[in-house]
Amino acid sequence: MKKSLLALAVLTAFAGAASAQSSVTIGGKIDLAVGKLIGSADKGLFDTPGSRLNFGGREDLGGGMAAVFGIEHRFSPDTGTSTSATNFWNGYSWVGLNGGFGTVRLGRDYTSAFINVQNQVDPFGGDNAGALRAALLAGVAKVRFANGVKYFNTMGGLSMSYDISEGGVNNTGAADATVVNKPWSGSVTYAAGPVWLAFSHENPGGKNDKLTTLGARFAMGPAVLRAGMSNGTNNANAKVKSYLLGANIRMGAGDIRLGYATLKTGSVTSMKRLGVGYHYDLSKRTKVYATLGRDSATAFKAEPTGFDFGIQHNF
């Protein structure tokens, strides 16, 4: 009996050690709003933040090294369908190694320029009817890469990231004759106290397209001030230039979001957008929000206004 108890104790200890060395997490969010988008006359339910279900994992390999993975499915909660007809793991699907050297990921992921710079400057985080992030993307930048490699590392307040993927495919992984080079992007960010500064440069893979983005944030009491600019050329060899100014102001459980962005493509002002919004936290994971966006550029003359009233639950 004592031997059986001892054996059970040893097995339990080994099982506990194994589970401590490996972990899998499940997360995501569901978001739905009533409203309309700038440039569209359609009113109804929609999901601008991108409802998602994701899985992530980490296995300790010893010596300070770990195997990591991440997969994310995007879906439309109003219909229950996938947002992509071709990619089930449309958000990302990567596997990699992490250690003292940094992190290497292989597969499909966000570009360094997008996730580390362009998305960080928008006070709306690219979500809702008032989102301003599109100005910094300037019709040039890609949100994701496919069939690629990504490396990133952080040393103190300095973070660096670089990704490169196969030429001849777009950011969904499908064949695309306009992508003649190997798409790549790189970013450097620096954070010290209330100050955050960022730089990125990228070539999304076309013969002529390239884009440089600068970003800054400054925390001041309950407010975070944001600024960004992008400059480059698109694949038609037209110059693009954009500016963004924004702020988030925290008031108790509420978050006031506001900003303004412009984009000029060649000689045409293709975006002049104002966004204002209010998000209210019902709990740590659930919030309600209201957002208004208006674009005075000629391209949106017929439908210059967008708005949404929604609820978001994170899990």
Model-identified regions with their sequence ranges:
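Outer-membrane beta-barrel proteins
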Residues: 1-315
